[in-house]
Design a protein with these regions (language model features):
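Mature-chain termini and adjacent capping regions
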Residues: 1-232
Length: 232
């Protein structure tokens, strides 16, 4: 542990400012690097970080967080928080009710209720999200009920989401319902939302049931370009 400023008070945890903490595996190879403006060393040896925290994994993956408390558990080789987490992505901000991470992993688990707010408008609500940035990937996965909301539609999925943010592809799993602002509904399965090039295209290769005032259509697959209002 390195810090620019060190405060030690009787019967209180050691306070560190501008801290850099490094963890090592059994062969003394560097695992994680954690950086924060402020941290405390508890009597147990655990280190509690406050505020902005940057975590760099063994393979160089960067996780940027803001939280009231995040604890480096020295005995279990885990990082954990039971406070609200704000996770900063490149084009999105994610909030959750806590987080867990093993020191030798590139995957972070954001637990409880999770909200992903994309910079260009859509909001995704789900639970218990896995964030995987290994080998340059940017994968978000959840098996919980997921709701995607944009300006024109609200999409609900019963079996979760598998999102590849590098490719701007969101896969909503299982039974899916699309509710349009006009009141129209589309029921299908395993929906892909393609956000590439600033667009919003809904695709499904499963059975589709479209309903609107005076309209009832069933089809074997669907392609819906939302910005141009073209459904085929």
């Amino acid at each position: 542990i390195e810090a620019e400023t060190y405060f030690s008070y009787k019967d209180s945890p050691v306070l560190l400012l501008e801290i850099v903490a490094k963890t090592y595996d059994k062969s003394q190879q560097e695992n994680l690097v954690l950086k924060s403006n402020r941290a405390k060393i508890m009597k147990s040896g655990d280190v509690v970080f406050n505020g902005d925290v940057n975590i760099v994994t063994k393979s160089g993956v960067l996780h940027q967080l803001d939280t009231e408390e995040l604890t480096l558990l020295t005995e279990s080789n885990q990082i954990k928080s039971e406070s609200e987490i704000t996770y900063l992505g490149i084009n999105e901000k994610i909030t959750s009710q806590g987080m867990e991470m093993n020191q030798d992993s590139d995957t972070m688990y954001l637990n409880g209720e999770v909200k992903i707010k994309q910079d260009f408008g859509p909001i995704i609500k789900t639970t218990n999200l896995f964030v995987n940035h290994y080998d340059g990937n940017k994968i978000y996965q959840s098996k919980g009920r997921t709701v995607y909301s944009s300006e024109d539609n609200t999409v609900s999925s019963e079996q979760g989401i598998d999102a590849d943010m590098n490719k701007d592809l969101l896969n909503l799993l299982g039974k899916v319902n699309i509710l349009g602002v006009s009141g129209s509904t589309i029921d299908s399965f395993n929906l892909t939302i393609d956000q590439s090039n600033g667009g919003e295209v809904f695709k499904s290769n499963d059975l589709v049931h479209y309903q609107a005032t005076g309209v009832n259509i069933k089809a074997k697959k669907m392609y819906y370009d939302v910005p141009v209002k073209k459904l085929s």
